[in-house]
Amino acid sequence: MIAKAKAISHGINDLRYITGESQHKKHPEKIYRVLDNLLPSEPDAMGIWNSMQLTISQHRPIKNSVIRIELSPSPKHTQFYDIEDWQKLWQDFAEEFDKQVITGKDGKIRSCPTNLANSKYSVWLHTESKGEVPHLHAAVCRLDENGNINNDHNIHLRAQRAAERVAKKRGWTTAEQIRNRNIPQVNRDCMEVLKAMPSWSWDEYKNTLIRKGYTVHEREDKKGL
């Protein structure tokens, strides 16, 4: 199971997307409300946004006022899921998300436990993606109902670890296990490409890997290399 999380400033656009109200969503009929927390009864995107903004206005302004979360379990684990099963999956994930204390290499606390449990959020099931792989989208208010901020330091790690813990508890294949299983094949493919090249060329190397089905992410160093 894979999870992503990020604090964003364009919360209303994200809400329109996850609720299926965005014009970019071609099949809103394949998007389902899973659950809302501390919100009015079944609000639309603007209703969710206004409710979150009300909470923020009562405490302090914050730029990135919404946490965007995506949760993607393997389809084989959720093929017989109903809405209540998806609700339980989200609640288990949120519990693991909240309880973590993230420390730096020096042992100092970088991020205290979050409080999604007492924060406004809305969770939706999307089944309209390529291959119709079901996955969850959530939008969470950065401030809980007591005015405390949900820290976003290393929030992507918080999400990944929460997903790993839930997957392990359920006996599911984890992202780490998939990565470890794929490493030998990736190494073999890379070496085969290198051995077949008459001379070194980054572009040729990259394009050959892409033709093999890999996605190559390029990063420049401080020298632009």
Mark where each language-model region is.
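N-terminal nicking endonuclease/strand-transfer module with a His-rich metal-binding environment
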Residues: 1-225
